[in-house]
């Protein structure tokens, strides 16, 4: 199946791609949200092929996200098509908030030939409900994980997140955005400056697991 038939968008890397990243959106905004497009373009400019997509509920303009099995199935379909489109030998998956959580679900399900997971703002719990943790699957993840978390994230601060991270047997890297919120926005800093920081962190992490590449 091709990317276009799935409503996915591919961002070609500058130069030969060193890796592929399939990036899923958060619960409230689709792949055309400025965060998603800026991050995708930033990775591509640094030598990583990127594919974004909309989950079924977003394509159908429904407000309530689909159940996890539906989201996971859609994610897997896009990963399969993205691998054919890219040709990169290393495949990473990830996403913003809910999309990142779904990526960890696929990592826990042992998706074939997965190199790692990149999460921008893991939604550990709903805001104001720290007892409703979304962590049961984390201990089953067997691939490296990078979590980029705002220091003031209402869905889970880095301090709250650390006990959950310790249940993951694979290597986990936690990058904290000082004074950042769940959207990784920081008062007093330009949005593009913060995004450049987190993209640089993520690309360096991908390079470390992929070897050198062109950008």
Q: Where are the predicted features?
A:
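Catalytic histidine neighborhood in serine/cysteine hydrolases
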Residues: 167-184
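Primarily recognizes the serine-hydrolase "nucleophile elbow" in alpha/beta-hydrolase
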Residues: 75-143
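Acidic catalytic loop of the alpha/beta-hydrolase fold
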Residues: 151-155, 182-183
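Catalytic active-site module of serine/aspartate enzymes centered on a nucleophile-bearing elbow/loop
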Residues: 180, 188-215
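Short beta-strand/loop motif that positions the catalytic acidic residue
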Residues: 141-142, 147-149, 153
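Short alpha-helix in the alpha/beta-hydrolase fold that links the catalytic acid
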Residues: 36, 134, 143, 157-165
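The conserved beta1-alpha1 loop
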Residues: 22-26, 121, 149
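Serine-hydrolase catalytic machinery in alpha/beta-hydrolase-like enzymes
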Residues: 1-91, 109, 181-187
């Amino acid at each position: 199946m091709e990317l276009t038939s799935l409503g996915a968008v591919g961002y070609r890397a500058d130069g030969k791609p060193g890796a592929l990243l399939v990036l899923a959106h958060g619960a409230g905004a689709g792949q055309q949200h400025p965060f998603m497009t800026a991050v995708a373009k930033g990775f591509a400019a640094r030598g990583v092929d990127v594919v974004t997509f909309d989950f079924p509920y977003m394509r159908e303009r429904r407000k309530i996200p689909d159940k996890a099995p539906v989201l996971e199935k859609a994610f897997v379909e896009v990963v399969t098509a993205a691998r054919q489109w890219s040709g990169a030998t290393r495949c990473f998956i990830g996403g913003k908030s809910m999309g990142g959580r779904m990526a960890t679900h696929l990592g826990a399900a042992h998706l074939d030939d997965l190199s790692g997971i990149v999460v921008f703002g893991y939604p550990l719990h709903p805001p104001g409900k720290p007892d409703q943790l979304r962590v049961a699957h984390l201990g089953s993840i067997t691939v490296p994980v990078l979590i980029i978390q705002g220091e003031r994230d209402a869905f889970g601060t880095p301090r709250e997140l650390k006990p959950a991270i310790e249940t993951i047997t694979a290597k986990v890297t936690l990058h904290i955005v000082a004074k950042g919120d769940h959207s990784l926005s920081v008062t007093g800093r330009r949005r593009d400056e913060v995004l450049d920081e987190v993209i640089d962190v993520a690309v360096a992490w991908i390079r470390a697991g992929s070897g050198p590449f062109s950008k």
